[in-house]
């Protein structure tokens, strides 16, 4: 047998037959207790691209579940995954809810929850750099995800505070040919930018 510190899961959508987007306290507690049985003592519940109404429900339920969570891995903040993603790299995200960042919308979201600690975004979208700067001013981590950005766009994003990459290799650009030229993508940028941190889905 082994004794070790508890795991901290920084990107988790559910567990034990529950999803955080179910929008119920029971789902949140069920996920927390399931993961605790396997050694996770803290986690960052992660959303999916959805309607703003569903997002607001998640914010309210998170607060209730956090106060009631006595047996499971503790909730240490929310990770918003979407809706500001590239349609070309949407992966498992609902393409019907993808959009570009607009200050009126994301400021409303930020005002609605003080629990957001990370927001995954495609940095090449119009308005994404400004959003990254806003998140940094709020001490929220902007993270690169579901993106078709080229290397130069990633560098610009990094300079604006996007210092992390969500599930590297999954739903993101690599070397592509555009007209007569080849461009490095997010995968290459992850290796070339020394201080960029990355997240890997270890089970494939």
Where is each model-derived feature located?
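Divalent metal-dependent hydrolysis catalytic cores, especially in the metallo-beta-lactamase
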Residues: 13, 29-58, 73-86, 113-124, ...
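Amphipathic alpha-helical segments in well-structured domains
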Residues: 25-28, 59, 183-187
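Flexible glycine-/small-residue-enriched beta->alpha junction loops
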Residues: 81-105
């Amino acid at each position: 047998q082994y004794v070790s510190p508890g795991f901290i899961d920084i990107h988790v959508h559910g567990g034990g037959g529950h999803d955080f987007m179910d929008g119920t306290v029971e789902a949140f507690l069920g996920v927390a207790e399931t993961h605790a049985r396997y050694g996770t003592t803290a986690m960052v519940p992660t959303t999916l691209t959805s309607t703003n109404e569903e997002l607001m429900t998640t914010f309210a339920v998170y607060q209730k579940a956090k106060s009631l969570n006595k047996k499971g891995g503790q909730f240490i903040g929310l990770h918003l995954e979407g809706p500001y993603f590239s349609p070309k790299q949407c992966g498992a995200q609902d393409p019907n809810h993808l959009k570009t960042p607009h200050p009126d919308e994301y400021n409303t979201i930020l005002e609605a929850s003080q629990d957001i600690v990370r927001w995954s975004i495609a940095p090449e979208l119009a308005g994404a750099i400004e959003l990254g700067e806003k998140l940094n001013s709020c001490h929220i981590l902007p993270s690169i995800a579901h993106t078709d950005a080229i290397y130069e766009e990633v560098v610009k994003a990094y300079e604006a505070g996007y210092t992390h990459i969500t599930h590297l290799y999954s739903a993101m650009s690599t070397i592509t040919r555009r007209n007569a030229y080849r461009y490095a993508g997010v995968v290459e940028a992850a290796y070339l930018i020394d201080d960029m941190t990355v997240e890997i889905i270890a089970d494939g």
